[in-house]
Amino acid sequence: MIKVGIVGATGYTGLELIRLLNNHPNAKIIALCSRVNTGKAVIEEFPSLIGYVDLDFIIPDDKTLFECDVIFFATPHGVAMNSVGQFLDKGIKIIDLSADFRIKDSSTWSKWYGIVHTQSALLKNAVYGLPEVYSSQIKNATLVANPGCYPTAIILALKPLLKANSINTKSIIADCKSGVSGAGRNSNIATLFCEVNESLKPYNVNQHRHKPEAQQVLTDIANTDVDFIFTPHLIPMTRGMLASVYVDLTKDIDVQELFKNHYQDNRFVHVLSVGVYPQTKSVKGTNNCHIGIQKSNNKLIIMTVIDNINKGASGQAIQNMNLMFGIDEGLGLEQIGLLP
């Protein structure tokens, strides 16, 4: 049984980790950390866990964490980088859901996140945790940087085309929409009900922190520089993400066949039939990504949907854990989408 600890257990991604791990046959949560709620019963904060979790919150410095086989960090950026070293030294595996280890160049990271990266040595050893791209590296990793939600949706849309060297890598447009849970569980005027209800708005246009992260991976896949225009939008729903990615084809190829062949062995990526377009509700509460494709002459639109706090965060983190421990990557992640 894999002994699990979660640091930052009261955020949305921390709660989602608890929900999913509760049904994992090979994992047991032994430590849930929260400085604000230390000593408080988990079920007092989250009544939905009554009957499932019988733990109290502990401080992130509690010795119980050193009994874990793996620790998930579901913390704001800047926390994990200064905390994970002590656990790695003891042979404990780390999966970081923050952005601390996603960007390989520390100066680039500091530019986008506004603070100095203090652990550039660890950046070199961190593996980017997108199983559909780096599964073999994840299997041998001790420190995994769990991807952001937007990069996950964008990269899965573009990977088959980049591998086939079939698109213009400088004219890509990524138009993305995310549910409000992507902003986290904190006090923020911009995400209050009255601010987001019955409204749709773009934000951080082409300046979102997820852009350099996605660019880094796309460039690695293509083996050439990749650039794209990125417009994220906030939509008035809790969970879900839709990425509509527009590209110019440089080859006359059967894109439907390309995508189906490329993802045929990937458990959680499903290419829809011609003329069928993905919808967020189909993947709500799951680790799945649905992909729809529309071609018009040399123009192609790839549409991907994911649950932003499942495949876009916690579900993907558990998929990574499964790979790191050499077990079936789908364990604990076989949920059907929540309908209606």
Curated annotation (Swiss-Prot):
Catalyzes the NADPH-dependent reduction of N-acetyl-5-glutamyl phosphate to yield N-acetyl-L-glutamate 5-semialdehyde. Keywords: Amino-acid biosynthesis, Arginine biosynthesis, Cytoplasm, NADP, Oxidoreductase. Pathway: Amino-acid biosynthesis; L-arginine biosynthesis; N(2)-acetyl-L-ornithine from L-glutamate: step 3/4. The lineage of its organism: Bacteria, Pseudomonadati, Pseudomonadota, Gammaproteobacteria, Candidatus Pseudothioglobaceae. It catalyses: N-acetyl-L-glutamate 5-semialdehyde + phosphate + NADP(+) = N-acetyl-L-glutamyl 5-phosphate + NADPH + H(+). PROSITE patterns: ARGC. It comes from Ruthia magnifica subsp. Calyptogena magnifica. SUPFAM superfamilies: Glyceraldehyde-3-phosphate dehydrogenase-like, C-terminal domain (SSF55347), NAD(P)-binding Rossmann-fold domains (SSF51735). It holds the Pfam family Semialdhyde_dhC_1. CDD domains: AGPR_1_C, AGPR_1_N. One of its GO terms (cellular component) is cytoplasm. Belongs to the NAGSA dehydrogenase family. Type 1 subfamily. GO terms for biological process: L-arginine biosynthetic process. It is found in: Cytoplasm. One of its GO terms (molecular function) is N-acetyl-gamma-glutamyl-phosphate reductase activity. Its EC number is 1.2.1.38. The active site is at 149. This is N-acetyl-gamma-glutamyl-phosphate reductase. The keyword Cytoplasm applies.
